[in-house]
């Protein structure tokens, strides 16, 4: 069985409030935030930044990033989406009712994996480099907004994605704590780590 239309009236109103014509510049920004290239580039840049900044925990943090994305994206796409089976707004609503400006296949809509992955990156990045936290979460929120703006997700999809990505990151951080330490490096003050660093 394919995805079914499982949205609420309130969520549809919220969707239409975000899925508006913001003009060429807003469209361009949303398309960049929604692109796979932006996600890949952002993840790689964060991995490099943590590797360079945190000599004391670089292996654990980079491993946590990779594991968080593996859980967030893999379990989200292979388990959660088929389990929920919710249709994207571009397919659920009548033709012409959605301003659809980004490609999206007719597959499960909840959770938004873009939102999940970016919130997973944001949490691991914040643990490894707390000063980056506000920027990372601002980017994650921007990506979540963009998925509704371009017409491919419901607001509930990106909220669920944020929650799932956060949980995936917490699981990844807990898992890498089990890895053996690779020698001693600078303390938290020198490495810029917070108290929750792995």
Which role fits each region the language model picked out?
Residues 32-36, 57-70, 159-162:
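Loop-to-helix transition at the N-terminal end of transmembrane alpha-helices
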Residues 36-40, 59-63, 132-137, 156:
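Short, aromatic-rich membrane-interface segments at the entry and exit
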Residues 42-53, 118-123:
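Hydrophobic, aromatic-rich transmembrane alpha-helices
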Residues 46, 71, 75-80, 168-179:
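Alpha-helical membrane-inserting segments
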């Amino acid at each position: 069985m394919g995805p079914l239309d499982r949205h609420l009236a309130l969520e549809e109103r919220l969707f239409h409030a975000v899925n508006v014509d913001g003009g060429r510049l807003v469209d361009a920004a949303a398309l960049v935030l929604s692109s796979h290239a932006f996600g890949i580039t952002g993840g790689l840049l964060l991995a490099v930044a943590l590797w360079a900044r945190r000599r004391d925990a670089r292996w654990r943090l980079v491993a946590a990033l990779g594991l968080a994305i593996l859980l967030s994206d893999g379990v989200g796409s292979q388990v959660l989406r088929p389990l929920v089976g919710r249709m994207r707004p571009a397919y659920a609503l009548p033709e012409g009712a959605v301003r659809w400006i980004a490609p999206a296949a007719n597959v499960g809509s909840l959770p938004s994996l873009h939102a999940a992955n970016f919130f997973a990156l944001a949490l691991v990045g914040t643990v490894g480099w707390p000063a980056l936290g506000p920027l990372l979460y601002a980017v994650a929120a921007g990506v979540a907004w963009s998925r509704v703006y371009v017409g491919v997700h419901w607001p509930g999809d990106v909220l669920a994605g944020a929650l799932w990505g956060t949980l995936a990151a917490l699981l990844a951080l807990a898992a890498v704590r089990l890895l053996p330490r690779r020698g001693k490096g600078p303390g938290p003050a020198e490495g810029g780590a917070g108290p929750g660093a792995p």
